[in-house]
Amino acid sequence: MKPIAIDDFCTVRSLANVTFSPEGTSACFTVSQAKKEKNCYKSRLYLLKGGRVRALTGGGKESSFCYLDENTVLFAGDREGEKEPSLTSRFYKIALDGGEADLAYTFPIPVSQVFPLKNGDLLVVGSTFPGFEDLYKGDKKLVKAYFDDKKENEDYEVISQLPWWWNGGTYTRGAYESLFYYDAKKKSLTRLTDAGFNVSDVQLAEDQKTVYFSLLDVSVPRPAHFGGQDLYRIDLASRRQKLVVKSRPDFVIATYALGKSFLLVMAADGKFGMNTDCDFYKLDYETLAVTPYAVYGEAIGSSVGCDVRHGGGQAFKMDGDVLYFISTRFDGAGLYKLEDGTVSPVLVRDGSVDCFDRKNGKMLLCALWDMKPQELYDETGRRVTHFNDAMLRGKYVAQPDPLNLTAGDHEVHGFILKPMDFEAGKKYPVIFDIHGGPKTVYGPVFYHEMQYWASRGYFVIFCNPTGSDGRGAFMDIRGKYGTVDFDDLMAFCDEALAKYPEMDADNLFETGGSYGGFMTNWIIGHTDRFRACASQRSISNWTSFYGVSDIGPDFSEDQCGSTIWPDVEKFWWHSPMKYADKVKTPTLFLHSLEDYRCPVDQGYQMYSALIAHGVESRLVLFRGENHELSRSGKPKHRIRRLNEITGWFEQHKG
């Protein structure tokens, strides 16, 4: 068997956005792959029809699409090139029976979504900017004025609201998405939603008479990004906008789905903070009355961690009045349905269903099953694509051994990967990997970095402590960071060492990112059991995180279970920086300079504290990367990251 190499994630092809044609005779989806030489990702559209799979495009930048009709697909792209600065968006159409893609639509603003209408027109979701709200009209003088203003002010940032930047982006500057109607004959856009409001979650009714969407007022100093968004609809004949239902603290709307006879709202009561899971509610189309439909309280969508997933897709869809949806339960994500107020499983296996579509009783699921990267499966669970067979052929893929234990009044679920060429009685070093979130889960899925370490001769252990997803409010961690979660992690580590005598307790290493980075920082201040640790994109100080993260004020107060004024001592108690003078463990810190979720100052603080106290430490910073470095960062940067962590552990082996 050959080992998994450090750059093998570049040979993985990731599938996403699987979508049936209007009549269900074909399906399209995207396939993405990292390209190490060009240090980028390429994405193409693929077609599944009659049991055959073939590439539909070859440009390498096709990631969003929709069906124009049964035999034509519309996708975003830019094959023309621009000689001057431009905001222009272009969409191309291609026939499923072959031929070249043709330019179909050109818009004067950045466009993220289009919804084809039966009359040949479109609904369009596009970006607009404060002070230049009429850019959608295509006035060249206004476009020039926009770029002149941008250049004139490029040395300044004027901040007037929270959050003032977003992870991986830049300062918010109040940009927002609006809904437009596109007249195909006149080739013109008409604004449907007012300036100063951000549109999201747009859904077109099946009869195409009404469009629904969430709306958020972004003109105020502190938009309610985490307070749920209000649901509106527009009658396309009259262009009249109507409020359908408002979010409130005890009814935080996450999303919704359009059924045949009612609208299904997924909303949380907020009893467990911003991570409260949703229940289901029925909304009458005529009266707009909202009534409880089903108590659920579990996660909707997949939160199973993975580093070979690129792209998204549907997590739920209504078929008549039956909701099909992905839900994370315990250590995996499966497909379920809600019918007549009752939830039941449809297709649940070890691993994760990442997205799906359903049409005329047929289904296609993009899933991480059988310890393989993503493939497509049908409604019976039969695999219908084989994109990643070749990359796994002849390679050692460690199979996860479940390890569950009782810790106090709850169970902790986890997994063990054995090293390549494992021999009973022989000692092996151990890497303990802690997930982010904390409201995510580790599951039995192909995780490149873990497989790489197993191929390098390490045991890899990982688990889902208190605070993880998949178990409803039972795992609530608010106000308890560094207490029960720390106890769970240490208990799991103890159990793993006891069950596998081949694990070398003198060569025990630990790493984690985001919440896992917080726990790494906490661990090194509370135990010396690890030979070396690697803290990635971490939180070290809740009092400063409050003011620098894009989610700082909301997330820090929610997760600390209090308000920073007057309870600053509680925030400090839960901060790893408070205990930095106790650290003895050699620690590597990795941060991305455009990570505004867990900003680099958090790493600076811990690194400075360790050096000041004479503890061996190293800080590695990545330019041009953000919070997603380990999952979608530039391929060469991902390799460097993994080399840094692995090299740090190798350097400190006993």
Predicted regions, residues:
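Active-site-proximal cap/loop segments of hydrolase catalytic domains
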Residues: 465-654
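Non-catalytic accessory segments flanking enzyme active sites
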Residues: 16-19, 156-160, 165-166, 170-178, ...
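Predominantly five- to eight-bladed beta-propeller fold
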Residues: 43, 128-180, 225-230, 278-281, ...
